Amino acid sequence: IATAFADSIPMICITGQVNSELLGSDVFQEADITGAVESFVKYSYLVKNVNDIPRVFKEAFYIANTGRKGPVLIDIPIDIQNATIKNFHYPEEVNLRTYKPTVKGHAAQIKKVIKELERAKRPIICAGGGVLLSEAEEELRSFAEEHGIPVVSTMMGIGVMPTEHPLYYGMVGNNGKTYANRAMNESDLLIMVGARVADRAVSQPDLITRNK
């Protein structure tokens, strides 16, 4: 589950729980799984009414597949598993007032990147799995070609550009290409797109920041 969260992989995790009437009594095999995974799921549900199941599953699949994708956990007590839903209806729409995923770029940050790009002499783009999940490979390639900017990728970003493309330098990080790492380290502007600034990709942060 934690790996799916880190890699932005949509996942629905269904777990079993003790009888709902026994929740909180520390009975045999009771585990606060929703609390245990709180830091590495997008959302978690503890179903206490069998009639909530259609809505919960509709919401869970929506949350897992929108915004930055990731895992959602649904914990179902044994009595709810054995209960019968009367007048089953799977909702057509989702109404989540508190869930508003970011789907548009930050205008001020984009303008800042453009200004920095105009000044840069050795810019480079590091693309991650977010580009693939957003199906934005074509837009990335067009942007790189229009501005003549080399592209490197994280492991999750392999496939953002054809390996034979003259602007694609390969994968960076601990297991990446030497020349790709060197190109990123010696750039004067690093544009991260759909990638986390993690140690697996940015293996030598001191070299990168030295030229920025």
Label for each model-derived stretch:
Residues I1-K212:
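N-terminal alpha/beta PP-like core and its mobile active-site loop of ThDP/TPP-dependent enzymes
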